[in-house]
Amino acid sequence: MELLRAKRMAEAGEIVPVMYKGKQVVIQHVDDEREMARVYFTDEPEHEQDVPVRLLEEQ
C-alpha cells in the first residue's frame, strides 16, 4: 500500500478492508518517517502492532 493512502485512511477514520498477512486490520496511525502503520486485527482489537505500510493490502 502507498504511504499517503494509508495515512489518509487513518486520518479519516475510514473502515476500509485492509489485509496484513491474510488477516483484516484497521489502520490507527501512520508514522511517515519509519513508514510503519499502527494497526489492530478486526477479530482481535486488543492486539495492536506496528507493521510496514508496504505490506498492507487494500481489498
Swiss-Prot record:
Superkingdom of origin: Bacteria
Keywords assigned by UniProt, alphabetized: Sporulation
Pfam families tied to this protein: SspH
Organism of derivation: Geobacillus kaustophilus (strain HTA426)
Stored InterPro entries: SASP_SspH
Protein known as: Small, acid-soluble spore protein H 2
Annotated localization: Spore core
Any one Gene Ontology cellular component term annotated for this protein: endospore-forming forespore
Protein's UniProt keywords contain Transmembrane helix: no
Induction: Expressed only in the forespore compartment of sporulating cells.
GO biological process: asexual sporulation; sporulation resulting in formation of a cellular spore
Keyword Heme included in the entry's annotation: no
Family: Belongs to the SspH family.
Gene responsible for this protein: sspH2
